[in-house]
Amino acid sequence: MAGVLVEAKRHNNMSHIKSKDTTPEIIFRKALWHCGIRYRKNYKKLPGTPDIAITKRKIAIFVDGDFWHARNHQDKPGEQIKTNRGYWVPKLSRNVERDKEVNDALLAEGWLVLRFWESDIKKDVMKCVREIEKYL
């Protein structure tokens, strides 16, 4: 019975995870706006729907979740997973692979692609903003 409750709780938790307008994205966008950097959010006209697009400069920005994009495990996504590895390892591997495909597609269209980890944004959002300012 306990296993069922744990699985039900996990399912409930996972169903509430958002793919856009996450807390790190909102923090980052507010910092950009405060610095006078204007952008489009969740720009559907581009491959991969960048979280932030600075269309005037052709800069596509992604805010990558540490878990979902396998931070520190890019070579072996899912290495940190202890349960249900049969699901998570292919899932995280595909996420990393898709990130590379999106980067290549955007580069082919002449866009600069910048990716920021959620933990870097939480640690020092202004450092991330300064990185973008280098290209403006």
Question: What residue ranges belong to the model's regions?
Answer:
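Nucleic-acid endo/exonuclease domains
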Residues: M1-L136
